[in-house]
Amino acid sequence: MTGKATSEASVSTPEETAPEPAKVPTTEPSGEVAASESTGQEQAPEPQKPQAQDPAAPAASAMPAATKPEPPSEDVPSAPLRLTLEDVSHSSLTVSWEPPEKLGKLGLQGYVLEFCREGASEWVPVNPRPVMVTQQTVRNLALGDKFFLRVTAVSSAGAGPPAVLDQPVHIQEITEAPKIRVPRHLRQTYIRQVGESVNLQIPFQGKPKPQVSWTHNGHALDNQRVNVRSGDQDSILFIRSAQRADSGRYELTVHLEGLEAKASIDILVIEKPGPPSSIKLLDVWGCNAALEWTPPQDTGNTELLGYTVQKADKRTGQWFTVLERYHPTTCTISDLIIGNSYSFRVFSENLCGLSDLATTTKELAHIHKADITAKPREFIERDFSEAPSFTQPLADHTSTPGYSTQLFCSVRASPKPKIIWMKNKMDIQGDPKYRAVSEQGVCTLEIRKPSPFDSGVYTCKAINVLGEASVDCRLEVKASATH
């Protein structure tokens, strides 16, 4: 019971008809209670003497009579609360309780757990002295015994009234239905290679010990090849050197008193496949060769992952892989070198790897040089001619008298256009006050030390054989203020 102090004890089971004195528990140095013989002079609190049984009362199943309780005293504690049977097995039982409602004026010294066999009248303490725990496990009980249990709270003034279980506790074999717990890695096909060992450990549950049996594909196991060892909680199947004949479904059956549980495990023993049965060079054209082959007769007891195709030049004899894990049985090998002769071979592949041998073409693939005639195309010269168009127009500008200023624009044309600058529609070329520059399509007009007289509308015109274009802007030269 979680959160409670616990104690364990072992109880001897003397025969009631024997003349020996009754056995009572004693405390070992370890703190646990072991069985030992008592002469009735133990220092533990004396059990209450039962009253004589009524002859008319049942002899076997009646609860043993207890002494008539004395009126409760304020010095002794009251009876413990909620005495509960927690667990029973074939050789032990566990009980728990809660502290009494009243501990008495002198305080609590501990609890005394007592048992009385069904049909007997003597209450025997489990511990030689009171223990400060609220849960105890009594061990070493005989199968088939029935006990009444009670617990008493004890103080220095004496023992209080007991708390008693209403029904006797029957010590009996616990039956647990069989159940097999297959490990996760065995829930899918278990694959091993030929020659490897197979060692399967399958846990199971069931009480008492169940009967275990194995079958292979519905038949009994071959004891010369397969070894089985079963314990109380698991069964081990072992094959020292697995062969392909060991593949199949192994079924584990656990029987217990008319109940059974079954689990199946699929084992697949594989090996490398054989090579393809045949290979044929179908055709050779240009720098290409077409191949075809047939699947192997032996796949290694498992599915093929594909084929590996290799080529080798006759001059070097070195093999190079062209295709890996290729599933079809026909392929075309491209990018072969002109003038070389090639051989081809194909391997089969499964989970164990490539086949030890490969199937090779008998004939060579000769890559011949073909006659090539060059037919040059007629050169068509592109016409880049274009009428003038301004890609960047002139922008209006404001200048200060006495400081040179510049106007910019850019033009696109082919052939190169003629650039003409004008002021107020009048050509200003040749005027030393202006300097015009045109380079890489960028047109610049510099006005040296302008005055208010130079204000006006400036125009840049571009002319070639395909047309002309022009852009305008306004220049304003502000006179300086006079004082």
UniProtKB/Swiss-Prot annotation:
<feature type="domain" description="Fibronectin type-III 2">
    <location>
        <begin position="275"/>
        <end position="370"/>
    </location>
</feature>
<feature type="compositionally biased region" description="Low complexity">
    <location>
        <begin position="41"/>
        <end position="66"/>
    </location>
</feature>
<dbReference type="InterPro" id="IPR003599">
    <property type="entry name" value="Ig_sub"/>
</dbReference>
<feature type="domain" description="Ig-like C2-type 1">
    <location>
        <begin position="178"/>
        <end position="266"/>
    </location>
</feature>
<feature type="compositionally biased region" description="Polar residues">
    <location>
        <begin position="1"/>
        <end position="15"/>
    </location>
</feature>
<feature type="region of interest" description="Disordered">
    <location>
        <begin position="1"/>
        <end position="78"/>
    </location>
</feature>
<dbReference type="Pfam" id="PF00041">
    <property type="entry name" value="fn3"/>
</dbReference>
<dbReference type="InterPro" id="IPR007110">
    <property type="entry name" value="Ig-like_dom"/>
</dbReference>
<feature type="modified residue" description="Phosphothreonine">
    <location>
        <position position="26"/>
    </location>
</feature>
<keyword id="KW-0393">Immunoglobulin domain</keyword>
<keyword id="KW-0787">Thick filament</keyword>
<dbReference type="InterPro" id="IPR050964">
    <property type="entry name" value="Striated_Muscle_Regulatory"/>
</dbReference>
<keyword id="KW-0597">Phosphoprotein</keyword>
<dbReference type="InterPro" id="IPR013098">
    <property type="entry name" value="Ig_I-set"/>
</dbReference>
<protein>
    <recommendedName>
        <fullName>Myosin-binding protein H</fullName>
    </recommendedName>
</protein>
<keyword id="KW-0514">Muscle protein</keyword>
<keyword id="KW-0130">Cell adhesion</keyword>
<keyword id="KW-0677">Repeat</keyword>
<comment type="function">
    <text>Binds to myosin; probably involved in interaction with thick myofilaments in the A-band.</text>
</comment>
<dbReference type="InterPro" id="IPR036116">
    <property type="entry name" value="FN3_sf"/>
</dbReference>
<dbReference type="InterPro" id="IPR036179">
    <property type="entry name" value="Ig-like_dom_sf"/>
</dbReference>
<feature type="modified residue" description="Phosphothreonine">
    <location>
        <position position="2"/>
    </location>
</feature>
<dbReference type="InterPro" id="IPR003598">
    <property type="entry name" value="Ig_sub2"/>
</dbReference>
<dbReference type="Pfam" id="PF07679">
    <property type="entry name" value="I-set"/>
</dbReference>
<dbReference type="GO" id="GO:0032982">
    <property type="term" value="C:myosin filament"/>
</dbReference>
<dbReference type="InterPro" id="IPR013783">
    <property type="entry name" value="Ig-like_fold"/>
</dbReference>
<dbReference type="InterPro" id="IPR003961">
    <property type="entry name" value="FN3_dom"/>
</dbReference>
<dbReference type="GO" id="GO:0007155">
    <property type="term" value="P:cell adhesion"/>
</dbReference>
<feature type="domain" description="Fibronectin type-III 1">
    <location>
        <begin position="79"/>
        <end position="174"/>
    </location>
</feature>
<feature type="modified residue" description="Phosphothreonine">
    <location>
        <position position="6"/>
    </location>
</feature>
<feature type="domain" description="Ig-like C2-type 2">
    <location>
        <begin position="388"/>
        <end position="472"/>
    </location>
</feature>
<comment type="similarity">
    <text>Belongs to the immunoglobulin superfamily. MyBP family.</text>
</comment>
